[in-house]
Every structure is written in C-alpha cells, then in structure tokens.
C-alpha cells in the first residue's frame, strides 16, 4: 500500500559533472530508474520505499561508488555498498 511507503532522500555531495544515479536492491540495480538532479552543490533525489534494509550505491559518470556518509556493507564478491534502513 502507498501508506506503507516512506520518503527517502538520497544526496551525493560534490561538484562531479555527472550523470549521477542511485542503484540498489530497491530498483534491481537499474541505472536508469533513479537519476539524481543537481541542486546547488549536490545531487539529489527523493524516492518512496517500504520499510526494510537496502544495499545501494551511486553510479557517478558510469563508475560505481558508495555513499560517503553511509554505512558500508561488503558484498560476497568483495564489492562495497552502502546500506539504507527504512524504519517502520
């Protein structure tokens, strides 16, 4: 249900030229699903997600990078991802 969704804001700081997108388990790691918009000196997007824990990363100009302000999860193949927990 839509009432079970929580608003989540993803921010990527800095003056990278872009494009920047957020990829994660909530969008099947699809780089086209959630592109961020540049607002002032950061990139930003708001999405609505159900409660849960989600590994995610940023795709910055085609390169995968983790959220510099997020918690780190180490994947089974050695990759590093950020972790988002959406509370009930």
Region locations from a protein language model:
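Aromatic-rich carbohydrate-binding modules that target alpha-glucans
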Residues: 2-53, 61-88
């Amino acid at each position: 249900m839509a009432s079970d969704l929580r608003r989540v804001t993803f921010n990527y700081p800095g003056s990278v030229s872009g494009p920047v997108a957020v990829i994660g388990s909530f969008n099947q790691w699809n780089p086209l699903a959630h592109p961020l918009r540049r607002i002032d000196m950061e990139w930003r997007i708001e999405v609505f997600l159900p409660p849960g824990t989600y590994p995610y990363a940023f795709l910055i100009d085609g390169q995968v990078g983790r959220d510099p302000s997020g918690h780190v999860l180490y994947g089974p193949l050695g990759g590093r991802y950020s972790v988002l927990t959406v509370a009930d």
